[in-house]
Amino acid sequence: MAKERGLISPSDFAQLQKYMEYSTKKVSDVLKLFEDGEMAKYVQGDAIGYEGFQQFLKIYLEVDNVPRHLSLALFQSFETGHCLNETNVTKDVVCLNDVSCYFSLLEGGRPEDKLEFTFKLYDTDRNGILDSSEVDKIILQMMRVAEYLDWDVSELRPILQEMMKEIDYDGSGSVSQAEWVRAGATTVPLLVLLGLEMTLKDDGQHMWRPKRFPRPVYCNLCESSIGLGKQGLSCNLCKYTVHDQCAMKALPCEVSTYAKSRKDIGVQSHVWVRGGCESGRCDRCQKKIRIYHSLTGLHCVWCHLEIHDDCLQAVGHECDCGLLRDHILPPSSIYPSVLASGPDRKNSKTSQKTMDDLNLSTSEALRIDPVPNTHPLLVFVNPKSGGKQGQRVLWKFQYILNPRQVFNLLKDGPEIGLRLFKDVPDSRILVCGGDGTVGWILETIDKANLPVLPPVAVLPLGTGNDLARCLRWGGGYEGQNLAKILKDLEMSKVVHMDRWSVEVIPQQTEEKSDPVPFQIINNYFSIGVDASIAHRFHIMREKYPEKFNSRMKNKLWYFEFATSESIFSTCKKLEESLTVEICGKPLDLSNLSLEGIAVLNIPSMHGGSNLWGDTRRPHGDIYGINQALGATAKVITDPDILKTCVPDLSDKRLEVVGLEGAIEMGQIYTKLKNAGRRLAKCSEITFHTTKTLPMQIDGEPWMQTPCTIKITHKNQMPMLMGPPPRSTNFFGFLS
């Protein structure tokens, strides 16, 4: 029986995407071989037969033996010159242009292009409209995709039929290409429903990681001991644990990240998994769970309640998500947007967007209605930050939160998560990484045009982390309990951090400059000695990363570079090579002998060094007068007033500090000296340089040829300030 054109199964499509993920080939590379290379013999006019198609897949996917069912399904999904027959495809042909177009779109085509291609795929009579029979085929494919995604298809067909009627904007009884593209790009996630965006198919699959167990653990499948100190596999999402050899027979993962039926929306139920009771005590009866003797006890994957098997009947059906409910999006709060009622779909905020503003994919296929009075947390993790810390943090958050709240930045980037959360009220963002990762997220938020800016907290990974220090999140994560950190986040307060635009205007010169790393300052900017040290540090770390894998080593390397810089003094008499203007007025540097100037948005630099220094309150009325002036004036250069100024990352002003040399910089970095020389506090600053000088923005150094640099206020970003540390009294007790 001939197979319907276009109806490649969702499982086949998912398998194809896996092959493409690991392939390095581009369609353009393969086409060259078919046009004038060794594969030209398979081309028949503008078409290829099944044998040629198999060769195309073999080269493009870099797989010697593509499964026959997959190659046949793909071959039969394209326009053909003859009636297809599953038993004999040797005489059939497909258009090479259709094949190349399809795979080019999968490589990364625009949503509009994908929608146009799918329209032509289902418009079998090529009359430019989709009639009722063609719409029925589309609904059939959507039902197959929904079944593959484990949705409740019993209630879905009438919903899809109603949705397809809504796409017919002019009520003509058919769907034009313009209506199809408009709907798919603004209101209806057609590409997801047709199986062309398959990232929703995560549920039911364990996320295994090897784990060595320091105490007795029992296999969830065969229930025998894995062995003390032996390695097994544990699922990051549900803690289902097995022997290596038992993994293939394991039951599906119990974690469903979103509701797949209308009846599951709104109320969350407990999801119990046997074992995994790490505390060893029942949360219901408070008695011990004998976890060392057999596979016993139950734990809920959402509230993390741990109970005896016999206590299950005493625990209610409904799950409140436990102590971290303020941060968690339970599956009952996330559901396919197609399950929303018709009026809700029509009034959706996405319907007001244009195609240029939106890429309807997985993020728009799901709708989020959070539990009232909660603050859903969107977590971005850079797994490369902090050595192996980033990966471990990613695993932990995937367990304690809904995995759909947690994004691997190296794999997904931040855009998908921001699109998913764009309409979620009272949401927060947690960035797990260094200052560079935080800057990346803030820049992406800038470009995302979100209706409301969610406040951002930082879990610092690795070294440095000046911004995290200023926001009271510490200098680096050291394996603390993440649940406690999330409870601290509940007590945090919002501050609006200034961000500054940097414009570098090079002079006409034959000398070539390094690229400027950023156009925005979040932390600091500097010229001269400290940038020179940072530049040498940066080059050495890129060349020999293994020598810079601890904070102590970094400090020693920095001190060594500072010592050599003090000998060569490459930035001596800096005032002869640059002039500084603050709010249009020149800053007098003539009586100073400086080798560096730092412009600070936050008081921390180089992993905790406070270049501005502490502000101590002296006695006398003059202090109060000076402090009042310092809190209001846009430009301050008076040394007496500067002594009273306290850095504030929300005051739309910058602190300007002079550095006398590398030795002073090294002393500040190693805490042997308190601060540099306070020069000014201002809301705008301009540098004019006459020779090539080292510079840095937020720890990223570069060499800059003669230029003009303008720093102006850009905007403010809501950030979360951690709660103040609890003090201890003389006897060591918390006060």
UniProtKB/Swiss-Prot annotation:
Location of N6-acetyllysine modifications: K484
* Pfam family, any one: DAGK_acc
Task: Please state the residue ranges covered by Phorbol-ester/DAG-type zinc fingers.
Answer: 205-253, 269-319
Which amino acid positions bind Ca(2+) 2, per UniProt? Answer: D168, D170, S172, S174, E179
Where in the numbering of this chain does the EF-hand domain appear? 110-145, 155-190
**Which keywords belong to this entry?**
Acetylation, ATP-binding, Calcium, Cytoplasm, Kinase, Lipid metabolism, Metal-binding, Nucleotide-binding, Repeat, Transferase, Zinc, Zinc-finger
Record field: catalytic activity: a 1,2-diacyl-sn-glycerol + ATP = a 1,2-diacyl-sn-glycero-3-phosphate + ADP + H(+); a 1-O-alkyl-sn-glycerol + ATP = a 1-O-alkyl-sn-glycero-3-phosphate + ADP + H(+); 1-O-alkyl-2-acyl-sn-glycerol + ATP = 1-O-alkyl-2-acyl-sn-glycero-3-phosphate + ADP + H(+); 1,2-dihexadecanoyl-sn-glycerol + ATP = 1,2-dihexadecanoyl-sn-glycero-3-phosphate + ADP + H(+)
According to its UniProt entry, the protein's GO biological process terms are: diacylglycerol metabolic process; glycerolipid metabolic process; intracellular signal transduction; lipid phosphorylation; phosphatidic acid biosynthetic process; phospholipase C-activating G protein-coupled receptor signaling pathway; platelet activation
Main location, first listed in the record: cytoplasm
Q: Name one GO cellular component term.
A: plasma membrane
The UniProt record lists the DAGKc domain at 372-506
- InterPro entries on file: ATP-NAD_kinase_N, C1-like_sf, C1_DGKalpha_rpt2, DAG_kinase_typeI_N, DGK, DGK_typeI_N_sf, Diacylglycerol_kin_accessory, Diacylglycerol_kinase_cat_dom
**GO MF term list:** alkylglycerol kinase activity; ATP binding; ATP-dependent diacylglycerol kinase activity; calcium ion binding; kinase activity; lipid binding; phospholipid binding; zinc ion binding
Per UniProt, activity regulation is: Stimulated by calcium and phosphatidylserine.
What does the tissue specificity note say?
Expressed in lymphocytes.
Write out the transmembrane intervals.
none
Tell me the pathway. Answer: Lipid metabolism; glycerolipid metabolism
The EC number(s) given in the record are: 2.7.1.107, 2.7.1.93
Where does the protein end up? Cytoplasm, Cytosol
Could you tell me what this protein does?
Answer: Diacylglycerol kinase that converts diacylglycerol/DAG into phosphatidic acid/phosphatidate/PA and regulates the respective levels of these two bioactive lipids. Thereby, acts as a central switch between the signaling pathways activated by these second messengers with different cellular targets and opposite effects in numerous biological processes. Also plays an important role in the biosynthesis of complex lipids. Can also phosphorylate 1-alkyl-2-acylglycerol in vitro as efficiently as diacylglycerol provided it contains an arachidonoyl group.
Q: Which family does it belong to?
A: Belongs to the eukaryotic diacylglycerol kinase family.
What do we know about how this protein assembles, alone or with others? Monomer.
State the name under which the record lists this protein. Answer: Diacylglycerol kinase alpha
Q: Which organism is it from?
A: Homo sapiens (Human)
Lineage, broadest ranks: Eukaryota, Metazoa, Chordata, Craniata, Vertebrata
